[in-house]
């Protein structure tokens, strides 16, 4: 694998849950605590050009885009408090978001910014994306060939996306593949590594999160098989590994400090705010950036 490092991230949602609940349950949050958000994910649209089996979106025919001015006002509240959280822009397909470049103009100010994309439009958008510093792109590639890609993505764009990503990487864009392993592909994970080595595009690979959707239940990995896989990759050399233990350690999860409530936030395409990507049900609703102030949103969170 030469000197290139493949990064492995594992876990079954425990990191996302722990970020919110450790403080709520272990320490209790009865007294006034400080708020320090390190990372915000904005699902800017539910418009998408794919229909993936494992996606937690409802895949509507009609779509809604978040108001970019509301995002900017919301982030200005953090700025006025001396905070500049890292930003992830997701969807849907964020490259279809009509105000993507206006948002990037604002957030690409030296902080870490990532766009999660399926890569289909990457070559078309490449020239503009190259203008932004501190921007990275994560290209979802959940199959290692056209057949396994179709099993998840329901289309035959595999070769096109691989080529788009390789072209973007060679042009100087900070881009990498993100592979989500399922029970169909976990035994062939080395083929993802081979694809990464062939294209020279970096790779992040992790098991599929289980959010309870029926199609995800069909694809989820059994616990024993997941443990065996983790042991196998630990035996490999030149691999940076982030396992479940690391994910919930105090050093990597700031939420574990009792005077801090939040480490992450997720804002959906309608402006609704939740503690993280996996906690989107009604009981975790914190407020809406279009109608609630910063203080109202975090006071709602304390009442959950």
Positions of predicted regions on the chain:
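Conserved alpha-helical substructure of the radical SAM core
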Residues: 2-133
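A broadly conserved sequence feature marking short terminus-proximal activation segments
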Residues: 2-24, 269-295
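Hydrophobic faces of well-ordered beta-strands that scaffold small-molecule active sites
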Residues: 40, 85-87, 113-115, 137-139, ...
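Residue-level detector of structured alpha->beta connecting loops
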Residues: 83, 133-134, 172, 200
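Radical SAM enzyme [4Fe-4S]-AdoMet core and its adjacent flexible, acidic
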Residues: 140-142, 147-285, 289
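Immediate flanking context of iron-sulfur cluster ligation sites
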Residues: 298-304
